[in-house]
Curated annotation (Swiss-Prot):
GO cellular component: plasma membrane; proton-transporting ATP synthase complex
Localization, UniProt: Cell membrane
This protein's name: ATP synthase gamma chain
Keywords, comma-separated and alphabetical: ATP synthesis, Cell membrane, CF(1), Hydrogen ion transport, Ion transport, Membrane, Transport
Biological process (GO), any one: proton motive force-driven plasma membrane ATP synthesis
Membrane topology (UniProt): Peripheral membrane protein
Gene Ontology MF, one: proton-transporting ATP synthase activity, rotational mechanism
Description of how the protein assembles with itself and partners: F-type ATPases have 2 components, CF(1) - the catalytic core - and CF(0) - the membrane proton channel. CF(1) has five subunits: alpha(3), beta(3), gamma(1), delta(1), epsilon(1). CF(0) has three main subunits: a, b and c.
Length: 297
């Protein structure tokens, strides 16, 4: 019985240590998520404005631009998968990787060849463990993305889209990320960025239709200037949305882990008390038996 009591006390101490760690991670995520949400909210108007500007060019002109035209000379397709650098975020990474696998299976079924571009150590580890080739990866700072990283990612994807077939050019660019809906809801999203599909931010509910523009020096020159910025803003916005989603998922997961640790501590405390009571009962029984034996002799 004494051995069982020691085991339960050791488990209580270990669980208390884990509880402190879970609680600290919950508080850290809670302190960072406010800033992450503000950054995502602040970046949204710029992304919408660029979408509207690009939409105006694509809608009111009849041009054959490489970034808006389907490419038929290759079946390679780029997939940018946005994951986290760390775990302890519930099903956050699992959900987005499952969505990426679904997209890859769909593309393969269509006769296309997915090319993986991955952000976050979790995604890199996932594909490396499965011996899946990654064209390029970016790690570090998934919970606090920087503009320079987004620009590097976007420029790499644009370079692949513009590259000839012999140099690994791709015909499409797809983005797989997690959209922050609320503190309790984060949604995996798949967006085809190139060739350009203007599917959001064109006309808001109750808003005005796109006005007519005259483009100087030409619509092609305007697209050349706008589309790289458009892709960079979409990538950066996706990184910000994923950052807020990661922190929200981590805060929720660590809160649940803290509560589970408290339940375990209560359980082990009861078991330790039961073992102690059994030990005391056994000692009393042995004393009484010894006294009876001495009295009988």
């Amino acid at each position: 019985m004494a051995g069982a009591q020691r085991v339960y006390k050791q488990r209580i101490r270990s669980t208390q240590t884990l509880k402190k760690m879970f609680r600290a991670m919950e508080l850290i995520a809670a302190s960072r998520i406010t800033r992450a949400r503000e950054h995502a909210r602040a970046a949204a108007p710029y992304s919408r404005a660029l979408t509207r500007a690009v939409s105006a060019v694509a809608t009111h002109t009849q041009i054959d631009h490489p970034l808006t035209t389907d490419r038929a000379d290759t079946n390679r397709v780029a997939m940018l998968v946005v994951t986290a650098d760390r775990g302890q975020a519930g099903a956050y990474n699992t959900t987005i990787l499952r969505e990426a696998e679904r997209l890859a299976a769909q593309l393969i079924e269509e006769g296309k060849e997915p090319q993986l571009y991955v952000t976050g150590r979790r995604g890199v580890g996932y594909y490396t463990f499965r011996h899946r080739e990654i064209v390029k990866s970016w790690t570090g700072g998934s919970d606090n993305p920087e503009v320079s990283t987004a620009e590097e990612i976007a420029d790499t994807l644009l370079e692949a889209f513009r590259a000839p077939v012999a140099e690994g050019g791709v015909s499409e660019i797809h983005l797989v990320y997690t959209r922050f809906a609320s503190m309790v809801s984060q949604e995996p999203r798949v967006v085809r960025m190139l060739p350009l599909e203007v599917v959001e931010g064109v006309v808001e509910a109750g808003g005005d239709v796109l006005p007519l523009y005259e483009f100087e020096p030409s619509p092609e020159a305007v697209l050349d200037a706008l589309l790289p910025r458009y892709i960079r803003s979409r990538v950066f916005n996706a990184l910000l949305q994923a950052s807020a989603s990661e922190l929200a998922a981590r805060q929720r997961a660590m809160h649940t882990a803290t509560e589970n640790a408290e339940d375990l501590i209560r359980k082990y405390t009861r078991l330790a008390n039961t073992a102690r009571q059994a030990e005391i009962t056994q000692e009393i029984s042995e004393i009484v038996s010894g006294a009876d034996a001495m009295a009988a002799s």
